[in-house]
Amino acid sequence: NTVSSFQVDCFLWHVRKRFADLELGDAPFLDRLCRDQKSLRGRSSTLGLDIETATRAGKQIVERILEEESDETLKMTIASAPAFRYPTDMTLEEMSRDWFMLMPKQKVAGSLCIRMDQAIMDKNIILKANFSVIFDRLETLILLRAFTEEGAIVGEISPLPSLPGHTNEDVKNAIGDLIGGLEWNDNTVRVSETLQRFAWRSSNEGGRPPLPPKQKRKMARTIESEV
């Protein structure tokens, strides 16, 4: 049920935090850890449950499961689980770097937040992203950023910690929003080959994904009106 699910999530987050404290986690692991922490705080407030108490209860649930779990069953479970991969266009420095906007524009699309600097004009821009992949398809966006040729960050798409969960289509639509807003100011935008491959399952030499017609004008107007 909802309470026991929250308790198990709290304990598993605690285990992952201990792992991170040993400096064993990579960038996607640490990013998910931070986002999940914010999500757990929100769920704690909604359910009226103390996180520390829930963590102890979650530990007891997990221990009971492990006591009943045979090694053979565990091997079969692991073998049948789909394998995730984590393509990384951006370095840790590019992901963690602070950036500022002269003319900030922001739009919330479902569980994704789209931000861009509309003071940027006549630039060549590339979209890079770090994300998880399952069955050769983008599963979860960790972070997407728009970079100029000089390396400046001028746009971003990030999941909202308070609204976890998004689909491949959500990500593609958000990318369309961002491209439309940037191209409104005569910037030339291309998408990294890695992102094209796993989001659209295609690769275009010009770096342009197959966005629906009129999306550029529509999305640019939407971003302008909603902020």
Curated annotation (Swiss-Prot):
The protein's role, per its UniProt record: Inhibits post-transcriptional processing of cellular pre-mRNA, by binding and inhibiting two cellular proteins that are required for the 3'-end processing of cellular pre-mRNAs: the 30 kDa cleavage and polyadenylation specificity factor/CPSF4 and the poly(A)-binding protein 2/PABPN1. In turn, unprocessed 3' end pre-mRNAs accumulate in the host nucleus and are no longer exported to the cytoplasm. Cellular protein synthesis is thereby shut off very early after virus infection.
Subcellular location: Host nucleus; Host cytoplasm
Entry comment, domain topic: The dsRNA-binding region is required for suppression of RNA silencing.
Chain residue ranges for the region called Disordered: 202-227
Sequence motif: Nuclear localization signal, positions: 31-35
Predominant subcellular localization, coarse grouping: host cell
Disulfide bonds: none
Cellular component, GO, one term: host cell nucleus
Motif (Nuclear export signal): 134-143
Keyword Ubl conjugation: yes
Pfam families: Flu_NS1 (PF00600)
PTM entry text: Upon interferon induction, ISGylated via host HERC5; this results in the impairment of NS1 interaction with RNA targets due to its inability to form homodimers and to interact with host EIF2AK2/PKR.
Keyword annotations from UniProtKB, A to Z: Eukaryotic host gene expression shutoff by virus, Host cytoplasm, Host gene expression shutoff by virus, Host mRNA suppression by virus, Host nucleus, Host-virus interaction, Inhibition of host innate immune response by virus, Inhibition of host interferon signaling pathway by virus, Inhibition of host PKR by virus, Inhibition of host pre-mRNA processing by virus, Inhibition of host RIG-I by virus, Inhibition of host RLR pathway by virus, Interferon antiviral system evasion, RNA-binding, Ubl conjugation, Viral immunoevasion
Name of the protein in question: Non-structural protein 1
Any one GO MF annotation of this record: protein serine/threonine kinase inhibitor activity
Family: Belongs to the influenza A viruses NS1 family.
Subunit structure: Homodimer. Interacts with host TRIM25 (via coiled coil); this interaction specifically inhibits TRIM25 multimerization and TRIM25-mediated RIGI CARD ubiquitination. Interacts with human EIF2AK2/PKR, CPSF4, IVNS1ABP and PABPN1.
GO biological process: symbiont-mediated suppression of host cytoplasmic pattern recognition receptor signaling pathway via inhibition of RIG-I activity; symbiont-mediated suppression of host gene expression; symbiont-mediated suppression of host mRNA processing; symbiont-mediated suppression of host PKR/eIFalpha signaling; symbiont-mediated suppression of host type I interferon-mediated signaling pathway
Annotated region described as PABPN1-binding, given as residue ranges: 220-227
